[in-house]
């Protein structure tokens, strides 16, 4: 989350909705100095991702910041719930199961989806750190039946987001999304890519890596992972997503 007292402006970071791309340049105007951009311990909530605190928890534990969201112009980015659920599964496998992108198979995705669904169906008071990316998007827009966030953009309209942020703050946001799931298109070289990934990440700055990756995508050497093939429509997971995230589907559709 970004809050700018100077601009009376706020960005609510919904997990897995291009938030890193939008938030990165806005750090320059963040009055909280990155307080809501970290993983850490909270006295009441335990170990949490401060970037992804829902509006309910914000109102309870950070009433001052919650009041600013009401008073300032707040915006958020939303995403198709099916795409977002898959993206969250990929991140969970990479971040908490230490799997490389190229090691994530359809069977592994299906197994992980079943585990996540069991956890969500247990209806915890709040989602723990390992499941925070599966929070409903609506929990970052509404609180106690009231819409708190003024402006909602779909991830498909990055050009409009760029123009909106520039108009409100004078800050330039790149249209190219960060944290995309990409892979080399040629399976024969993927073992070599896996071998070199860690030293490459350690030696080459992120900005340069991102630039090179975009060039490789343009050249057809790298491409977005075909996540749609991992969990086909009409199955058990699809049914769960459509039920659990019903309000999110409506929220995304209304933003298009």
Language-model features and meaning:
Residues 1-256:
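Membrane-interface amphipathic segments in extracytoplasmic regions
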């Amino acid at each position: 989350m970004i809050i700018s007292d100077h601009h009376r402006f706020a960005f609510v970071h919904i997990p897995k909705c291009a938030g890193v791309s939008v938030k990165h340049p806005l750090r320059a105007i963040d009055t909280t100095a990155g307080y809501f951009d970290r993983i850490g311990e909270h006295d009441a909530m335990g170990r949490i991702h401060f970037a992804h605190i829902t509006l309910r928890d914000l109102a309870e534990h950070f009433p001052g910041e919650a009041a600013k969201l009401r008073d300032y112009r707040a915006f958020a980015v939303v995403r198709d719930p099916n795409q977002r659920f898959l993206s969250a599964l990929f991140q969970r496998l990479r971040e908490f199961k230490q799997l490389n992108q190229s090691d994530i198979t359809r069977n592994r995705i299906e197994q992980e989806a079943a585990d996540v669904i069991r956890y969500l169906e247990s209806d915890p008071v709040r989602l723990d750190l390992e499941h925070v990316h599966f929070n409903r998007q609506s929990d970052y827009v509404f609180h106690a039946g009231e819409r708190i966030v003024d402006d909602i953009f779909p991830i498909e309209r990055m050009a409009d987001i760029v123009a909106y942020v520039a108009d409100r703050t004078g800050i330039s946001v790149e249209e190219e999304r960060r944290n995309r799931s990409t892979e080399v298109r040629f399976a024969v070289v993927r073992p070599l890519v896996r071998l070199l990934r860690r030293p490459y990440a350690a030696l080459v700055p992120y900005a340069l890596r991102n630039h090179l990756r975009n060039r490789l995508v343009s050249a057809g050497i790298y491409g977005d992972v075909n996540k749609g093939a991992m969990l086909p429509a009409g199955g058990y997971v699809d049914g769960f997503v459509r039920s659990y995230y019903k309000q999110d589907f409506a929220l995304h559709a209304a933003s298009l």
